[in-house]
Amino acid sequence: GCPVCVTPVGFIDEAIWLALEKGVTICTFGDLVRVPGTKMSLAGAREKGAKIRIVYSPADAEKYASKHPEEQVVFLSVGFETTTPAECLSVKKAKKDGLMNYSLLMANKTMPQAYEALKGSADIFLYPGHVNAITGTELCEKLTEEGVSGVVAGFTAKELLTALAVALVKFQEGKPFFVNCYPRVVKAEGSREAQQLTDEMTKACDSEWRGLGMIPGSGVCLKEDWSAFDARKKYDIPPIQGKANPACRCGDVLQGKCKPSDCKVFGKVCTPQHPVGACMVSNEGACAAYYAYGDNK
């Protein structure tokens, strides 16, 4: 799934507050720049003078901070188990290099609690292959024992179609199942090194998911030993409750409750050029994909 799509409006508002009120330099992946906040996007904040830089990795952000010690640099850390280790590494390097002008604003999430929240409303989980490459498949196998079926899929068209075909055949057998259809990347044990790094530096926290609400224990934040690099603590960010456009059905799309074209703003007010919701921003988003390739035209 796309981490941008489940990132709540309030996170964008926090980043804008840091940029406009504290004058920090925001380093972010490009997809986040156009995601609407309550009043504006990061692109809109940039037009008001905010310093917004697009980077391709947290290492790029840490490197920028090292070259610009006069600036306070905050990296917008979003993603699942796949990206959290790289963000932890950037903090570890910053601490080693004595870079106290670098920190993370974290909206990282973990999948187990999301599976728990959704398992009653799904026939089959199409597990994200790159997440399972880190976490392994133990949880998927455990969920099968609870009656929850699923397959791990890769990301090419052939891999996705293979996983879907396997899922349909197994589903018709009428018994809970789990099949790893991405064995060239996903191993049962996952990546022990990545798991250990994440466990060393982070702890679980409650986290808000766009469309799903607050899911206890589904977020990731830095442990106390690394709290100097936690932007929320460093800048004492006030509680910000973001408000999404009520016409946007991004949350329902994420849960499979409706097609993107069922949303009344889809393809009209909401387009890739002028997105109303996060699902239209990223090329990994369901609405953007449906706009480009669906039967809506």
What residues fall within each predicted segment?
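Short amphipathic alpha-helical segments
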Residues: 87-89, 138-139
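Gly/Ser/Thr-rich loops at beta-strand to alpha-helix junctions
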Residues: 2-7, 31-35, 76-86, 111, ...
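Conserved mixed alpha/beta catalytic, RNA-binding, or beta-rich assembly cores of soluble enzyme
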Residues: 1-12, 29-32, 52-58, 108-112, ...
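A conserved active-site cap/scaffold subdomain adjacent to cofactor or substrate pockets
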Residues: 103, 120-186
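Glycine/charged-rich beta-loop-alpha catalytic/anionic-binding loops adjacent to active sites
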Residues: 69-74, 144-147, 244
